[in-house]
C-alpha cells in the first residue's frame, strides 16, 4: 500500500511539472481575437485598471475587465441600456466614474469603474454645440448636465446640476452659452482657502437683460445654484466692470478664461482669472484675436498657450505664451500650421517639462500671395518654447505629422514612458503626405532620432517604454511589429486576421504589458466586421528588472552642451529602464515619478510683472504705477521703485548665489509720467481743401488698442486718415482720387474707398493698411444709392451695383448687380437691370443666411416697372413679390415694401414681412383720413413695432404718425399732423438708450396751413412708445435766470407755454441727434419756450432724466457733443464766428468757457466718436482773420487731462461715491415702471471727479416686473384715443374680427373679446389692469372644451360669491356714508398710487366693495339656482361652468422671450399671425 504522504508528494511534483510556461521566456506575445458587430465610436480604459469601455455606433456599450480578452454588452436594469447609449464620457479628474448618455432622456452613471451602472432620467438630449457634461475640478460627485434647443445659429441651453452623482438633479438655469463650475480644474485655487469659498460657484453665459443677441450676452455667477438669486451676480471682467458679448468660458489648469466679442467687430477680448474675483484682459502685443480664430492649447501650470489664426485662407497662426497670471502674451512661434477646424500642430512631450513639438509653415509669403501649397516643417523646443530647432536624423532634417493629420487616439508623439517619442514622417526639406511617411523614434526626448520602420504605422508604448508596438495603417495587415529595446531592433508576429487598424492603445499610464488593437476587415466605413486584439507581452521576458537594469537618474532635458538643463528652477530626472535590459519593469499602474534637483536663479526664472519692453530686454511698468508721494516733482527726478520683474510663481530656483531681478531699482520719473495737469489741450491742423466727407471708425469694447480713427475725403478728392482723433493726419493713398467712402455697417474695422473707375481700396484693420480690389463695373451713377451692400454676418460677402453700358452710345445705361464672397477678389453676376440689391439675412429670420432682395426692371428694360424679387441661392431661381414697386426698406426685423395700388395708380399700398417670404398688406387705422396715400416714411423701429409717417396729401408737409403691432401688419394712429419736409423726412426721433421715449414736432395749425398759412410747430414727447403724447415741460427760468414770456406751469407743458425744439428736418447733419446711446437719460436741443417753435428765438436746452424735466443750458444756438458717456458735454456757438467753446462736467448744472483758437473761426461742425465715449472732440471750420485767407482747419480738443482717475464701481454693484443707480421714470407714474418693468442703470454722479472709461452703458438690472397699467396699452385697430386717455371704437366701424384667431388655429378653445386696447409690444407687465383681456368667449364648436376649462362646481361658486357679501356690504356701507360721494366717471389711465388715504377715490376699499354691492341683486336672484346646483353637484348629475375665464398674466416679450421660466403663462396674441416674437437686433441696450 502506497503511503499517503508519498501520494501527496507525487501530486505536488506532478502539479509543478504541469504548470504552464508563463514564467518561462516566450518567443512571441499572446493575443485574443474578438469580434464587435458595429463600429466603435469611443473607447477608453479606466486609469490603473484593465477595464475598458467601447461605445458602438448602434448605441451599445461594451465592457471588458481584462483588457479586451472578453467582452460583454452592458444592458443595465431591465435591459434598458441596450441600443440606447448615444455618448460615452469619462470623468476627466476621477478614475472611477463614467457616464453613458442616452437618446430618450435615460442616462447612466458608474462610480465603480463600470462594475455597476445606475440610471438617472433627464428629459433632455445631450447638448451638441456645448459640452453635455461639465465637471467639477475637486468634487467628482458634482456635474452639470446640459441640453439645448437650437434654431439656426442660436441655442437655448438648459443646465442641470447634481451634487450627489445624479441621484438628484435640479435645474441650474437657462442660458445661451452654457454653464460651468468656477472650480473647473483640480489645479484651480488648489493651494488657497478660496477653494472652500467657491466650492458651489457656477458661472453661466446668459442673454442681455434687454437684448437676447450674442453681442449682449453676460457672464453671471451664483454661489447657491441661482436659487435665492435667480439672475445671479454679473462678473466684473474688466477693471471692476461687467462686459457684454461674452461667448464662452474655459477652465485651463489654474486659469479660468472668458472670451467676449462686441457688436460690430470680429475681434475678441480674452479675460483671465486665477481666483474668479480679479479678472484681467489678456494682451497679445498688438495682435488681434478673432472669433473661431484662436485655439487654447495644452498649457503648463504657470502659463497659457494660445495659437492665433493670422491667415484664414491658408491656415497659419502665431503661438503665444502667457506670463504666470495669463494677462500678457509673448509671441513664441510664427506661422504655425493649422487646419480649418482650428486644430494646431502643437504637442508637449508628456511628463517632461519644457519640451514642445510644433509644425510651422516654411513658405508663408508664397502661400498668402501666390496660393501655393504649404511647405510644413517640424521643430522642437527644449526650453519651454523660448527657442526652437529642427528635428534631426543624423545630419538630415526630420518632419513629422502632428495633430492635424493624426490617425490614432491619445497623444500623437509621446506617452508617460519617459523620453520615448515616436512619429510618422519623412526626412528632407518639408513634410510630405502621410502615405509617404515612415516611422521614426527617439529615446532621448527628441534630441536625436532614428528610422524605425518603413511606411506609416499606428504605434503605442507599454511597460514605461520597455515595449513599443506598431502596426502598418496604410493597408490591410495582420502583422504586428514590436521592439523591446527602444526601437533599435524590431520583431514581428502575424495575428489571425488581416485588418485595417483603427486604433492601437493601452492603459493611460503606459505601464501595462497589454495592448488593445481595434480594426475593421473592410476599408469602407460600416462594411465588414470590427475586430479587437488583446495582445499580452508578459511572457517575452522571464524576469523583472532589478536595480542594475535602470538608469537611476536619466536627465529629461539637456542643454546645448549635453548637460542636464534647468527649467522653472530645477533639473528633472527619471528612473528609467536601460534599452538593452532583458527584463520588464512589470510595475503595472505605477507611474514613473520625476526627480527634481534645484538650480540657482537665472534671468529665465523671472517674468515681467506687466509686460516686456519693446526691445525685449526689460519690463514696462504698469500704467497704474504712481511714484511715492513727494517724488517726481519734475520729469528729471528719480525714485526707488519696482524693477518690473517678478519670480515666476511656482519657480523653485535658489536665490542665494543667483540673480535677483525683482529687487527695487532707481526709476526715472519721466517713464512713469507726470500727474495730469487738469488742463484741456487743443491741436489745430490745416487742410488745403475743404473736408466734405468725414467718418469715424468706431472702436468696440473687445477691440484692442486705443486709436480713435477718422477718415476724410476733401473737395479735391484726396483721402486723409487720423488715428489720434485729428491731432495728426496722414495720406496713405496719396495721388489716388478717392470720391466715395463706404463704412461696413456691421463690422466697424472695415471700410472701402472707391474711385470713379473699377478700382478701389479696403481696410480691415481700422485704416492701418489698405489693399486694392477691382470691381466688375464702375459704381452706379445713382448718387443716392451706395454701390456696395454688405452681409450682416459675413464681412467678406459683398454686392456691387455698377453702371453698365453707360459709356456707349446705345443710350441703355443701367445698373447690374454682382456678388463676391471673398471681399472683391472675384465677382459673379447676380442680376441685370437692377436698381439695388441687399442681403436680408437676420438673426430674426432663421435660415436666411443667403436671402437677397433685389429691385429689378421687368424684362430687363428700364422703361418697365420695378419688381421686388428675392432669392436664397443667388438668383439661380427667385420669388417675385410685387410688380410696380415704388420702394422697399428694412427696419429692424421688418421688411416694408410700397407698390402702386392696381386700382388707383396715384396711390400706394404698404406691405410688411417678418420672415422675408410672406408679405401682408398693412391695415391702416380707419381714422386715418387720407383717401390717397402718396408717400410713406419708415421711421426708426427699435421696439418691435414700425413707426410709419404717412403724407397727408400731395402738397402737405405733414401727416399722421401710425404705429404697427409686433408683426407690422396692423396700424393704429399714434399722433396726427407730424411735421415733415419736402424730401419726406419727418421730425421724429427716438431717444437712444431708453425704451419708448420719442420726440416729434407736430403742426399745431393744420387748418390755417391748408389755407396757405405758415406752419406753427409744437414739440411733443412720448414715454411709452407713442401710446401717449404730451407737450414738453418748459424750465422755469432761462440760462440767465430770467422768466420766459409765457406763464410756465411747473413740470407740465401747456398749449400756451411749453418747450419746442428744432428737429430732424432742420439739421445740417442727420448724425447730430438729441441723445446719445452712452449718455443715458440725457438730451440736448435748440429751441424756445412759448406757444410754438420760433424761427428767430432759440436757446440751448438740456435734460438728464429722459425728457421729464428740462433746463436752459445757454442762451443762443449751439452745436453739441457728448464725451466719456456724458461725463463731459461740449457746446460750440452755431453760425457765428467764435474762438470759445463751453463745457460741462456735471450734466449741464454748470458751464466753463475754454478758448480753443487765437483767431475766431466759423465752426461748421463738432464731432466725436459715434458712441460718445471719447474724451476728444474735433471742431471743423475756417479761420476768419488769417493772413493767407480763410484757412480750413480742424481743431482737436482733448479733455483727458482734466481728470486723473477712473471712476470706481463697487463689486456689489450698488451706488457708491462715483456711481448712482438711476431708474428711468414715466411722468404720469410714480413707480418707475416703464414697459412693465423697472430698469436700473449705473450713472456717474455729476460731482464725481473721475472718468467713466466705459464703452458700453450697462443695464445694471431689471429691478422687477410691474403690474399692468394703462401705460402698457395702446388703442387697438379700429379704435382711437379720446381726450381722457381711453380708447373708443371709431363711429360706424365694426369691432375687429376676434374670431379670426380661432379660424387660424383649429385647436384653439377660446378668444378674447375686443376691448379697444392692445399691449405695447415691448411691455413685460404681469397681472394688474390687463386692458386687452377683459372677457373670453369660446371659439365656434368649442363650447364644451371651454366649459371644461373654466368651470367650477356649485360649492366653489357658492363660497366664492356668497360668503364675501356680508363683509363687502359692511365696508361698502361705511365707505358710502363717509366718503365724499363724488362717484364720477372712472378715467382710464389714472394711477392708483396718487393718494394713500384709505377712503380716497383710488382706495381699493372703495372701488372693490362698490363693484360688489352693484352685484348684490343679481347674486340674490341666483341663490335658488346655486342651491340646486350644489345638490346636483353632490349627486353627480351635472356641473355648471363659470361664464368667465381667468385672465392669465401676459407673457414676456421681445428680449425677455429668452428668459424662459420667469413668467407663468403665455397668452396668444390675435395680431401675431404672421410670425413669432422676434429679437431686435437694433436695440442698443444690454
Curated annotation (Swiss-Prot):
BNR repeats lie at residues 63-72, 380-389, 440-450, 482-491, 720-730, 761-771, 818-828, 1101-1111, 1142-1152. Residues 1-23 form the signal peptide. Glycans are attached at residues 200, 301, 967, 1265. Residues 24-1350, 1429-1486 are lumenal. Keywords: Glycoprotein, Golgi apparatus, Membrane, Protein transport, Receptor, Repeat, Signal, Transmembrane, Transmembrane helix, Transport. Pfam families: Sortilin-Vps10, Sortilin_C. The keyword Signal applies. One of its GO terms (biological process) is protein targeting to vacuole. GO terms for cellular component: cytosol; Golgi apparatus; membrane. Residues 1372-1407 are cytoplasmic. It is a multi-pass membrane protein. Its main location: Golgi. It is found in: Golgi apparatus, trans-Golgi network membrane; Prevacuolar compartment membrane. The keyword Cell membrane does not apply. The chain crosses the membrane at residues 1351-1371, 1408-1428. Functions as a sorting receptor in the Golgi compartment required for the intracellular sorting and delivery of soluble vacuolar proteins, like carboxypeptidase Y (CPY) and proteinase A. Executes multiple rounds of sorting by cycling between the late Golgi and a prevacuolar endosome-like compartment. Belongs to the VPS10-related sortilin family. This is Vacuolar protein sorting/targeting protein 10.
